[in-house]
């Protein structure tokens, strides 16, 4: 559907911007409350759209705890972004001029949907360079961000990190 977008790379952002410029949507649903989904929600709001974020967990940004996420929730709501937590999207149907987004606990109508869920790190270049990646595709680094190649350091969204509190690996 031309009103439903994924968000994984720069060309995806161009398609979203072109749709907004050419169709003047009034509302959007962002599916997924990770870093990318939240950033997109803020940008859509800044562009003048009514924005709803739907997140399956009880808080946005899975890598932070619930208490810290509360500040993010307050910031988003203060800026007019609606949050629907602990609910997921079951279906998206095009009813002509609007999209109907069916949730587990209700329905929403909007002009466009951004899918920002299940994003895998873009580590193709790292793999081609022979760097070690974990089972989820994130670039493995040590506590100094050094990769498996002693001459290459890595930072950014595609890098495995160690949670300073729990010691668990993530990205």
Identify the residue ranges that each predicted region occupies.
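Short hydrophobic/aromatic-rich motifs at helix boundaries and adjacent loops
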Residues: 43-46, 95-96, 153-158
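FAD-site-proximal beta/loop scaffold in flavoenzymes
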Residues: 2-21, 100, 107-171
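A Rossmann-like FAD-binding core segment of flavoenzymes
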Residues: 46-143
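Conserved catalytic/dimer-interface elements of ABC ATPase nucleotide-binding domains
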Residues: 29, 84, 153
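Rossmann-like NAD(P)H-binding beta-loop-alpha module
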Residues: 12-64, 81
């Amino acid at each position: 559907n031309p009103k439903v977008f994924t968000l994984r790379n720069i060309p995806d952002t161009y398609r979203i911007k072109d749709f907004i410029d050419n169709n003047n949507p009034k509302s959007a649903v962002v599916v997924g409350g990770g870093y990318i989904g939240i950033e997109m929600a803020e940008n859509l709001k800044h562009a003048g759209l009514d924005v709803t974020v739907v997140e399956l967990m009880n808080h946005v940004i899975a890598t932070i705890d619930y208490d810290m996420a509360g500040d993010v929730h307050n910031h988003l709501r203060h800026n007019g972004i609606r949050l629907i937590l602990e609910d997921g999207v079951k279906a998206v149907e095009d009813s002509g001029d609007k999209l109907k987004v069916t949730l587990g606990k209700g329905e929403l109508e909007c002009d466009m949907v951004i899918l920002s869920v299940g994003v895998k790190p873009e580590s193709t270049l790292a793999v081609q360079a022979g760097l070690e990646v974990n089972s989820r595709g994130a670039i493995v680094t040590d506590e100094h961000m050094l990769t498996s190649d002693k001459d290459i350091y890595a930072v950014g969204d595609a890098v495995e990190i160690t949670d300073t509190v729990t010691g668990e690996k993530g990205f």
